[in-house]
């Protein structure tokens, strides 16, 4: 599918990062004290004999390394985000010599968090919030050189890229709320001249969807009941009657993924009429809807498509760990080859227009992430720059295991256990002796724990603690029933799931019963407070980060 995921708004300033880091350090110090060990080095030596103590600053403030790898549409260049003089910037390198990278942007204060190649491969776009005033601006920087230029107003306007396609090289679609702060009107942007032309005035529509030829095909409007209506757009005219509607209970798990290049197929991620979100192909000529991808326990969470035809040829689910399913013989062979070459979860980040080069992210779970360039013709897989956190390369980190935990009423929780290095000498996924353990509760609660690497949990395992993070009821990604099972259950069945996870860890010889801490932020912080209020006998201590205290 042509790239039209857009550039999401986002900003994380250095002050905010430092504040979060200091908060985490204080919390970790509290954990060390409350479970009965005052000497972190002694605890690490006893329970993590396989690794030296890693400094807290290295784990929390070390270089983030390479992120958001992309290949240019023409396949000649590869790019990523990495620090330049301490600030995240865009780096580029020829695909023939990816080790010869150079920073193409040189932002000094405001980090770049999202970017994209232009469809003609001659420039890059990135989104930035200057000074934190929420006026998101789209900038363009030419590959050949020169300073960046602002393509959208720099004051009192929030802009975003709505659509771009390798089939249309001279323009992209952008949204801006300069006319009305509530709504984003849709514009066509000439990538060479920078000229903006109004295509559609929003007047209450929250978003627009275009096909690979950048013809606007759908407009989405919110309903008073929380659902969504999808209206057809033809030649710039919006049909007043919706052709599809999404009920409130399906809004989080149903969305338009895009159109095929011939315009005949509309792809959906769709949970309507079923528990889990499936991949649905809607034939717009006949009205027939086929389901090429579905999983009984997990939602379809991402897809990848041929850049020129727009046909989705693989999808991902994550019931416990990431699982990709190819829908064509070629894609199945590619995915199998990548699985043979790389250990861990993969992410297909970007594909060239000719589909001969891919950028693939690797998430080992117990190691920082990496980026790779995959040449499909030669089947060669080349690492693009080492681990995402370069400061940890060569260090021994904890072993992460994906486990399933059954709650008292039969609900299955997908969970992730990380053990200190050297604590599991026979490799059976259980420590040689029970350990002090920290139960990490994710926020939301409409979020989920994943197998991916987390610096804070690594800090704990390096210091001799086992860590356990679990997808209690109310967590997303496991179907509507798993989410709705948490309705009205704050402090009740959602809390029972956490207690059941602790009991499982104790029964498995993982955790010392009298040395279990609970830690979390947002909803996780609430769960900490509820745990200490309702079941204080289960926990030695708890660390609450900005959890709600009253409901």
What positions do the PLM features span?
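Non-catalytic accessory segments flanking enzyme active sites
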Residues: 67-68, 113, 136, 152, ...
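Hydrophobic beta-strand positions that form the internal "hydrophobic ladder"
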Residues: 75-78, 124-125, 172, 217, ...
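Residue-level detector of Asp-centered blade-edge/turn motifs that repeat once per structural unit
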Residues: 73-74, 119-120, 166-168, 212-213, ...
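A flexible loop/linker signature enriched in serine peptidases of the S9 family
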Residues: 63, 81-89, 106-112, 127-139, ...
């Amino acid at each position: 599918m042509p790239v039209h995921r857009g550039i999401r708004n986002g900003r994380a300033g250095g002050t905010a990062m430092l504040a979060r880091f200091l908060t985490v350090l204080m919390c970790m110090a509290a954990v060390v004290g409350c479970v009965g060990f005052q000497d972190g080095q002694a605890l690490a030596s006893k329970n993590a004999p396989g690794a030296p103590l890693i400094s807290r600053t290295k784990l929390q403030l070390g270089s983030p390394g390479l992120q958001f790898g992309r290949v240019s549409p023409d396949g000649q260049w590869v790019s990523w985000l990495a620090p330049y003089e301490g600030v995240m910037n865009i780096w580029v390198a020829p695909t023939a010599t990816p080790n010869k990278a150079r920073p193409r942007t040189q932002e000094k204060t405001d980090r770049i968090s999202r970017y994209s190649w232009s469809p003609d491969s001659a420039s890059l776009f990135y989104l930035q919030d200057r000074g934190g005033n929420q006026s998101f601006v789209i900038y363009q920087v030419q590959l050949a050189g020169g300073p960046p230029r602002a393509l959208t107003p720099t004051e009192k306007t929030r802009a975003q890229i709505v659509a771009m396609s390798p089939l249309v090289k001279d323009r992209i679609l952008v949204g801006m709320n300069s006319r009305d702060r509530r709504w984003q009107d849709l514009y066509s942007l000439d990538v060479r001249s920078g000229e903006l032309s109004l295509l559609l005035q929003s007047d209450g529509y929250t978003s627009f969807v275009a096909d690979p030829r950048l013809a606007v095909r759908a407009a989405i409007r919110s309903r008073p009941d929380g659902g969504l209506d999808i209206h057809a757009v033809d030649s710039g005219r919006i049909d007043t009657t919706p052709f599809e509607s999404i009920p409130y209970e399906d809004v989080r798990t149903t969305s338009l993924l895009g159109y095929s290049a011939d315009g005949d197929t509309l792809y959906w991620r769709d949970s309507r009429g079923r528990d889990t979100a499936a991949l649905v192909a809607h034939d717009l000529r006949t009205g027939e809807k086929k389901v090429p991808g579905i999983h009984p326990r997990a939602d379809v969470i991402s897809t990848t498509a041929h850049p020129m035809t727009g046909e989705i040829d693989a999808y991902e689910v994550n019931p416990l760990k990431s699982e990709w399913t190819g829908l064509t013989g070629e894609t199945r062979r590619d995915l199998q080859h990548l699985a043979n070459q790389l250990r861990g979860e993969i992410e297909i980040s970007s594909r060239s227009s000719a589909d001969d080069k891919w950028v693939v992210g690797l998430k080992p779970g117990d190691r920082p992430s990496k980026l790779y360039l995959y040449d499909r013709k030669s089947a060669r897989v080349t690492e693009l720059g080492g681990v995402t956190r370069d400061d940890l390369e060569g260090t021994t980190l904890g072993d992460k295991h994906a486990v399933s935990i059954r709650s008292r009423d039969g609900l299955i929780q997908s969970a992730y256990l990380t053990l200190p290095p050297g604590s599991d000498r026979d490799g059976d996924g259980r420590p040689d002796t029970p350990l002090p353990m920290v139960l990490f509760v994710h926020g939301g609660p409409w979020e989920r724990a994943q197998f991916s690497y987390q610096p804070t949990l690594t800090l704990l395992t390096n210091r001799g603690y086992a860590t356990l993070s679990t997808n209690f009821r109310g967590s997303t990604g496991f179907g509507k029933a798993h989410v709705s099972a948490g309705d009205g259950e704050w402090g009740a069945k959602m809390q029972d799931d956490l207690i059941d996870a602790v009991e499982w860890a104790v029964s498995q010889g993982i955790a010392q019963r009298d040395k279990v801490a609970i830690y979390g932020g947002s909803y996780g912080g609430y769960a900490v407070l509820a745990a200490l209020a309702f079941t204080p006998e289960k926990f030695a201590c708890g660390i609450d980060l900005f959890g709600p205290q009253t409901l």
